[in-house]
């Protein structure tokens, strides 16, 4: 965790909350469903950043993996499944699309430069395996993992079966709709 002052923390909190509010309003008010889905992903990412401000690293990672990586992608796929051919048109690129493309390219170049210029051989505060084994399970990630694989294993597996049944049901419904059309 990078130590930041209380005023910086408060400022980041206010900025993230404002971004969440604007994104949530966009989700509700925009007429195109795909834009709403993309703004929903933006809101999920902002919530993950709030978790990082609260020193809940595992929750931030879970937020990104589960909500942005799974739920939002599922919504986008559902939109693609039910969209009509009228929605997809070959039209000239708008100014927003051009700005988005340049922003993406700039971010890609910036991240690539950061990856190659970062010194990856510095090891800060790495503990040996014996030190880790002697420590009690005190971190959030270790505690959550311990409880998920011991006390909560049966409900965890039931949840995975429920998700599997929902996935099979969605595939069945989608295939029946394509057959009738």
Swiss-Prot record:
The gene is ndhG. The chain crosses the membrane at residues 10-30, 33-53, 62-82, 98-118, 153-173. It comes from the Eukaryota. One of its GO terms (molecular function) is quinone binding. One of its GO terms (cellular component) is chloroplast thylakoid membrane. It is a multi-pass membrane protein. It is found in: Plastid, Chloroplast thylakoid membrane. InterPro entries: NADH_UbQ/plastoQ_OxRdtase_su6 (IPR001457), Nuo/plastoQ_OxRdtase_6_NuoJ (IPR042106). It is an enzyme of class 7 (translocase). Belongs to the complex I subunit 6 family. It catalyses: a plastoquinone + NADH + (n+1) H(+)(in) = a plastoquinol + NAD(+) + n H(+)(out); a plastoquinone + NADPH + (n+1) H(+)(in) = a plastoquinol + NADP(+) + n H(+)(out). PANTHER family: NADH-UBIQUINONE OXIDOREDUCTASE CHAIN 6. This is NAD(P)H-quinone oxidoreductase subunit 6, chloroplastic. Its EC number is 7.1.1.-. Keywords: Chloroplast, Membrane, NAD, NADP, Plastid, Plastoquinone, Quinone, Thylakoid, Translocase, Transmembrane, Transmembrane helix, Transport. NDH is composed of at least 16 different subunits, 5 of which are encoded in the nucleus. NCBIfam families: PRK06638.1-3. NDH shuttles electrons from NAD(P)H:plastoquinone, via FMN and iron-sulfur (Fe-S) centers, to quinones in the photosynthetic chain and possibly in a chloroplast respiratory chain. The immediate electron acceptor for the enzyme in this species is believed to be plastoquinone. Couples the redox reaction to proton translocation, and thus conserves the redox energy in a proton gradient. Its main location: plastid.
């Amino acid at each position: 965790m990078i130590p930041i002052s209380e005023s910086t923390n408060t400022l980041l909190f206010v900025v993230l909350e404002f971004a969440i509010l604007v994104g949530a309003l966009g989700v509700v008010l925009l007429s195109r469903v795909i834009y709403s889905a993309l703004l929903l992903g933006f809101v999920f990412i902002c919530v993950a950043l709030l978790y990082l401000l609260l020193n809940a690293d595992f929750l931030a990672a879970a937020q990104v993996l589960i909500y942005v990586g799974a739920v939002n992608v599922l919504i986008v796929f559902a939109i693609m499944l039910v969209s009509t051919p009228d929605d997809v048109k070959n039209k000239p690129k708008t100014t927003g699309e051009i700005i988005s493309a340049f922003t993406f390219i700039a971010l890609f170049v910036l991240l690539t430069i950061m990856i190659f210029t970062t010194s990856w051989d510095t090891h800060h505060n790495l503990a040996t395996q014996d030190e880790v084994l002697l420590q009690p399970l005190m971190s959030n990630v270790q505690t959550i993992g311990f409880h998920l694989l011991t006390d909560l294993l049966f409900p965890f597996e039931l949840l995975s079966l429920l998700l599997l049944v929902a996935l099979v049901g969605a595939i069945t419904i989608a295939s029946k709709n394509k057959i009738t059309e």
